[in-house]
Regions:
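Hydrophobic anchor at the beta1->P-loop junction of P-loop NTPases
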Residues: 25
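Hydrophobic positions on the alpha1 helix immediately C-terminal to the Walker A/P-loop
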Residues: 36
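N-terminal pre-Walker A segment at the start of P-loop NTPase domains
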Residues: 1-14
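Short regulatory helix/loop adjacent to the ATP-binding pocket of P-loop NTPases
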Residues: 108-123, 140
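Conserved lysine of the Walker
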Residues: 33
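Conserved nucleotide-sensing/catalytic segment adjacent to the nucleotide-binding pocket
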Residues: 59-101
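Accessory nucleic acid-recognition modules appended to NTPase machines
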Residues: 161-327
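Domain-level recognition of nuclease-like catalytic cores that cleave nucleotide substrates
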Residues: 139, 365-387
């Protein structure tokens, strides 16, 4: 794989494979799961359940299917045949030296229950699109608008596709496969409207009642549809931070898309240059930085730990990352020009939050950086230095 872009999660997965008989990787379509597992376990026999003949064999004779070899087996698209999990459990219980790698394009029921079905036997990981650190040297990171517009899906970063072709096909496949076939959502027109309205609310508090009124469905339906977007890895809900805080807090999560390029497509942004005129540019930039923090946690095999802060007095900090009992507090600004006003929330945060704060930083798009003061000033290209 000469054009393979190495992923930061590789070391974590290889370490886990020393202790688990099963490695499972889930994530959105086209995030590089199959490529990653093929790279990490090249000697495993690979079977893709996209192949209808292979799928039919797996369903009709799972024991024979799983015992075609005594070597490792990599099963791609495991969610297409969830009954295999019980048989895999039996195999690794009887022979812990047998090894399986599994990938799934969603965290629908099969992936959500996988860690329960194979408790103590499986290392379960999530792979999102590429991080900025992963594509350093592979794409032009100086052109912020281009990064936001293109997004960070592997096929785009590896220059095997371009955004204007990739995202229309991606959304069409998502609507036709995941939404219709797997989730039985009949009203695709309203669901598509809902999807676009979600993109218009990047970085905003999620309000099911308000969104339902715009789409023309109940808040209960909106909540269900939102769970669909989460289950298929299109969006992330960022929870508010609430520990050691005496003030009244906002309880609603913030909504972000898992890739800025997908958000741009849903917002009808047709060129990178259009972003300079678009009111959503700041929110899309914030979206990218928030997802960098979440990807960093996933790549270390960790869940949670990423929050925002907002209280009833409208005091707000864009991003809080909890590590080893301390917080990193980050304000995100899309501007290239530094302003002292960027520091306001970070200078006051100790009055709002009692948890120790180890690092404060402003992440922006300007080139000047300063890491010698109380508040670090960081260009987005170097976000990994404070994660």
């Amino acid at each position: 794989m000469t054009d393979y872009i190495h992923r930061k999660i590789e070391e974590t997965i290889l370490e886990a494979s020393k202790y688990f008989s099963v490695i499972a990787v889930s994530g959105p379509r086209q995030s590089g799961k199959s490529t990653l597992l093929t790279q990490l376990f090249p000697l495993y026999e690979k079977y893709s359940l996209k192949d209808l003949n292979i799928l039919d064999y797996a369903k009709n004779d799972p024991i024979a299917f799983l015992n075609q070899t005594d070597e490792g087996i990599f099963i791609d698209e495991i969610q297409r045949c969830p009954q295999l999990l019980d048989y895999i459990q039996g195999i690794v219980d009887n022979n812990p030296k047998r090894h399986f790698a599994l990938s799934g394009s969603s965290n629908f029921e099969v992936m959500k229950n996988l860690s329960e079905s194979l408790a103590g036997r499986a290392g379960v990981f999530e792979l999102l699109p590429m991080s900025i650190q992963e594509v350093t040297g592979k794409v032009d990171l100086d052109n912020l608008n281009q990064i936001l517009y293109n997004g960070l899906y592997p096929s785009i970063c590896a220059k095997k596709n371009i955004a204007k072709f990739f995202y229309p096909s991606y959304v069409k496949t998502y609507l036709e496969k995941d939404v219709r076939d797997l989730l039985q959502i009949k009203d695709q027109i309203r669901f598509t409207k809902f999807l676009k309205l979600c993109a218009a609310r990047i970085g905003s508090l999620f309000n099911a009642t308000e969104l339902g009124a715009e789409v023309g469905v109940s808040s209960k339906t909106i909540s269900h549809w939102l769970s669909v977007l989460q289950a298929s890895y299109l969006i992330t809900l960022l929870p508010p931070y609430y520990e050691n805080i005496p003030k009244r807090l906002v309880k609603s999560p913030k909504l972000y898309f898992n890739d800025p390029g997908l958000a741009c497509y849903l917002l009808d942004i047709e060129t990178p240059q259009q972003l300079d005129r678009d009111k959503m540019r700041g929110a899309i930039f914030e979206n990218m930085i928030v997802m960098e923090a979440i990807k960093h946690r996933y790549n270390m095999g960790l869940e949670g730990g990423v929050f925002f802060y907002r209280d009833s007095n409208q005091n707000e900090v864009d991003l809080l990352i909890k590590q080893e009992g301390e917080l990193t507090a980050i304000e995100v600004k899309s501007s290239m020009t530094y302003s002292s006003s960027f520091e306001k929330a970070l200078t006051q945060i100790e009055g709002w939050i009692k948890t120790p704060i180890s690092t404060k930083a402003i992440v922006y798009s300007g080139d000047f950086e300063n890491t010698s003061g109380n508040i670090n000033l960081i260009n987005y290209r170097h976000i990994s230095s404070i994660l």
